[in-house]
Design a protein with these regions (language model features):
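A conserved mid-domain beta-alpha-beta active-site/ligand-binding segment of alpha/beta enzyme cores
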Residues: 181-200, 204-209
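Predominantly the C-terminal beta-signal and adjacent terminal strand-loop region
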Residues: 206-248
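Start-of-domain marker
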Residues: 22-62
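Sec-dependent N-terminal signal peptides
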Residues: 3-13
C-alpha cells in the first residue's frame, strides 16, 4: 500500500510501505494543567508502533486489522487505560483543598473499532469509537504532513471527540456523598452527552535515520456539559511536551 501515517494519541507514527513496515519504540513527556480543580501534571506517553501480521500495538492500544485497502485500514482495538491520556483521570489527593475527598476517577478498560485513512499524500485521518464499563466515546482526527526539509516534518492536526452521558457522569459527575464530604462542593451534578474540539501541532526531527525527536503542543476546548461540573476549573486544556523514539 502507499505511505500511510498512523498516529496514536499524540505522535506515535509508523509509515507503511509496499514491502516493509517500520516499527518504533519511544516515550514522550506530556505536561498539562488539568481542567479539574487540581495540580499540574506530567505524564509519560508511550510512542510505540509494533506490528506482526494483522496484530499491532499503537501506544498502549492493541489491535487486530479486520480489513485493509490501499488507503484505509479497519481494525478492532482495546485500550486498557481509557480516559488516562485524555486528562479525565484524577486522584482525590491531587485535587485542591476542599475537593480532596472525592472518589478517584480512574482509567477504564475500553474496546471498539478504529479506521485509519488517507485523504491525499499529505493528509491522513483517524476515526474510532470505544465502549467501556463507564460509558463510551468517539474520536475523529485529521492531520496534515508538511515536509520542511529531509529531516524536519511539521504535523498540524485537528480533532473532535464525543463523550456519552455515562462517561461524562463518571468523570465529572458529583454524588450526594461527595457534596457532604467536600466543603467546597455545594451541589450534586449529573453528567450528560458532551464533546470537545482540539488542535495541535507536532514537529519531528530526524537526528539519525533511526532516532527521531518530537516536540508538540495542543489546545482542547470542552463543552459546558463538562465545564459546568463543580469539579472542573475551566473549559479548556493546554498541553505540550517532547519525546524521542527509535525506529527499526
Amino acid at each position: 500500500m502507499k505511505k500511510l501515517l498512523l498516529m496514536g494519541f499524540l505522535i506515535s507514527a509508523a509509515v507503511y510501505g509496499e514491502d516493509f513496515q517500520v516499527q518504533t519504540i519511544g516515550v514522550a513527556g506530556k505536561y498539562y494543567q488539568s481542567f479539574y480543580k487540581s495540580d499540574k501534571k506530567i505524564i509519560p506517553v508511550p510512542l510505540i508502533n509494533l506490528n506482526y501480521n494483522r496484530f499491532f500495538l499503537n501506544g498502549v492500544k492493541a489491535g487486530f486489522t479486520l480489513y485493509e485497502e490501499e488507503d484505509f485500514k479497519f481494525s478492532a482495538i482495546i485500550d486498557p487505560l481509557g480516559g488516562y491520556f485524555d486528562g479525565f483521570t484524577v486522584k482525590a489527593k491531587d485535587m485542591d483543598k476542599g475537593y480532596e475527598k472525592i472518589e478517584d476517577r480512574d482509567s477504564k478498560f475500553m474496546y471498539g473499532l478504529n479506521l485509519d485513512f488517507n485523504l491525499s499524500e499529505n493528509v491522513f485521518g483517524n476515526i474510532n469509537y470505544m465502549f467501556g464499563e463507564e460509558g463510551d466515546k468517539g474520536e475523529a482526527y485529521l492531520t496534515y504532513v508538511g515536509y520542511i526539509t529531509d529531516r524536519l516534518v511539521i504535523l498540524p492536526s485537528i480533532s473532535a471527540k464525543y463523550y456519552s452521558d455515562d462517561f461524562v457522569d463518571y468523570y465529572v459527575g458529583v454524588t450526594k456523598k461527595e457534596v457532604l464530604e467536600n466543603e467546597k462542593i455545594k451541589k450534586e451534578y449529573k453528567g450528560d452527552n458532551s464533546f470537545s474540539l482540539g488542535a495541535s501541532i507536532t514537529a519531528e526531527y530526524s537526528i539519525t535515520e533511526q532516532f527521531i525527536m518530537s516536540a508538540f503542543a495542543g489546545y482542547e476546548y470542552f463543552d459546558d456539559k463538562i465545564s459546568d461540573s463543580p469539579l472542573i476549573d475551566k473549559d479548556n486544556q493546554v498541553y505540550y511536551g517532547v519525546g524521542f523514539r527509535y525506529s527499526f
